[in-house]
Amino acid sequence: PDSPGSFIEIFRTSMEDKIGFEKFQLVMKTIISQQAKIVEADYDIPFTGHHFQNRGSMINWSPIGRNANNGSRQQFIAMDKMCQIRSQHINMFRRLMLSEGVEDVVIKLGGDTSFDIYPAGWDKTFALKHFPESDWDVMFVGDRCGPNGNDHELYEHLRHQDRSFETSGPEETIEIIDTCINKLLGVISEIDT
């Protein structure tokens, strides 16, 4: 990278190319239909716009909108805990996809307010293909490590090597990273002596 904070893209792929145009359109129509059901259910939640984001390799769907402020996010989180909005719609989305014969698309919880939808096999472990185990000690911190969470597969993959950590938020993430860095610095100083 040329400057701090910049990155080098090492791989790019497309969900639409992987599953095909027709399946991709079916996925999008299903997401839009499910969003309409959430609106029609008249939950006491705000809708802020920007509900869908095509990230190339996946679709991110946020029922309240990706641009929601913190107050709106907290309102949705409370309602989701009480009514299980996202759990219901994960199950409904899966049933609808299976009824259409689409078995190669996955939906998982993403963060506190959204879903991630991607081709089967393209969970976060997909990135490890670009970092051979012999060359990298990949560590992972995630907030959705349970079975329906978008961090689950990578968390489980690295957990047996003590290289994955579940976090409750940004403050704990900083603590986890600080601990990992301090352990690494301790190992380096042992090697130097």
Which residues fall in each region the model found?
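Active-site phosphate-binding/coordination module
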Residues: 1-50
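Hydrophobic, Leu/Ile/Phe/Ala-enriched alpha-helical segments that form helix-helix packing faces
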Residues: 27-43, 89-101, 180-184, 188
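Conserved acidic, metal-coordinating active-site core of Asp-based
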Residues: 42-139
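General small-molecule cofactor/ligand-binding pocket signal
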Residues: 11, 108, 165
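Alpha-helix boundary/N-cap detector
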Residues: 19-23, 84, 88, 168
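Exposed alpha-helical structural elements
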Residues: 23-27, 88, 92, 127, ...
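Mg2+-dependent phosphoryl-transfer enzymes with acidic/Ser/Thr/Gly-rich catalytic loops
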Residues: 118-193
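A short acidic, often aromatic-flanked loop/helix-cap motif at beta-alpha or helix-coil junctions
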Residues: 1-6, 18, 114-117, 170-175
